[in-house]
Amino acid sequence: MIKVDLSNIQSFLRLPYEAAVSPRLKIAHSHLQLGNGRGGEFTGWVHLPRDYDRAEYERIKAAAKKIQSDSKALVVIGIGGSYLGARGVIECLCSPNYNLKKKNTPNIYFIGNGLSSEALTEAMELVEGVDFSVNVISKSGTTTEPAVAFRFFRELLEKRYGKDEAARRIYATTDAHKGALKSLANANGYETFVVPDNIGGRYSVLTAVGLLPIAAAGIDIDALMSGAQEMMETCAAGDMERNPAWRYAGARYELYHMGRKIEILAAYEPSFRFMAEWWKQLYGESEGKENKGLFPASVEFTADLHSMGQYIQQGERHLFETVVRFGPSAHQQQVPFDEGNGDGLNFLAGKSMDFIARQAMDGTLLAHVEGGVPNIIVETGSNDAHTLGGLIYFFEYACGLSGYLLDVNPFDQPGVEAYKKNMFALLGKPGYEELREQLVKKLGR
């Protein structure tokens, strides 16, 4: 069960803020439940954990088993919401060192999320002499980064296996009916999975977009979905007391309007790093428009206490922290006793790393709050697939609420098009000739 502890923000708020924000939350909640707010056509994720396509879900499981049986590596090609959620779940539940561990599942390499020649070359070298499959994820099939990467890996597969066997090793997650990737998949006989029309990329981790690579990594997607459904039912409640997403969204909204413009997501587990990257895209793209929105950042404690800790403690007071806390680790490592005690740490001998970490958490919390930084605590209880499914849904629902509280569309991202237009023009894409001339002059080329 996800719990949101707001006790460490109360002294920073105008009280009682709940009475002021609850009517707005009620409206936002209704928009999500009924799909009748701005961007309501993209709220398919709200009831997805209950209403997902069971037939496709079984095909996802079957494809994952096939990949596990015939491939030592799976190359996942996608950018943004097409890969961050899957990578976040895999690293959180398996390990950031997943590819280095002994296992009966394939290594998973994420590519097509940038334009680095070095990263592309390295990924191609990693599958040399290794049986591999490809999961290419793109609704349109024309997004530059994944489309370019797919050209390279499709060619690599076809050279190694021939076109027929290569086709059996390519899984395309794309639009159900149209688009360049769908057409290519139909023409070549790739197995396809659907990016739903009513779910945007950053909300799609619990669709085939995330579930196929997650299942290929051996993670129990039944547990992931059941956790999400449990949280969906919890988030259907229309009040702050019963709905943790209301509490989180309401607190963020109030802190934002009190001048706290930056939210730092913190966790004490290195495995949470890419879940934080997913969270940053989720909130950054959903809220950051019309000159509004919190700036989402993330830190990994305790490592970043030795870098960002100084700023958080004594820098500009325009931020707050949201700290994700997991329950006890399954691995209870105890500090050994050292006869010489040269490091002076024998006072820790016999104590578990979990115990030490908890004292670091509590000490940091007190220091930051006393230093003028409000802290929201999100308690997860445990770190397993069921809990993580609930955490994903919790963050998604709170994000939808947050967008509506700010009176923006939480489901579009019009600002992303600006760089794309310039990039296409500079690359010489047909139809961008006039813009290219303007940009070349500005760049002084």
Regions found by a protein language model. Name each.
Residues 1-65, 339-347, 435-445:
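Extended, charge-enriched "interface" segments that sit outside catalytic cores
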Residues 59-72, 123-131, 252-261, 312-317:
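Glycine-rich phosphate/diphosphate-binding loops that line cofactor/substrate pockets in enzymes
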Residues 65-238, 425:
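Glycine-rich phosphate-binding loops that contact phosphosugars or nucleotide phosphates
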Residues 91-94, 124-127, 151-153, 186-188, ...:
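Short, solvent-exposed amphipathic alpha-helical segments in soluble enzyme
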Residues 138-143, 213-219, 271, 328-330, ...:
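A generic structural motif
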Residues 160-322, 327-330, 415-445:
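Active-site phosphate/pyrophosphate-binding segments
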Residues 297-384:
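Helicase-primase coupling helices
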Residues 376-378, 382-445:
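C-terminal helical/tail subdomains of lipid-metabolizing enzymes
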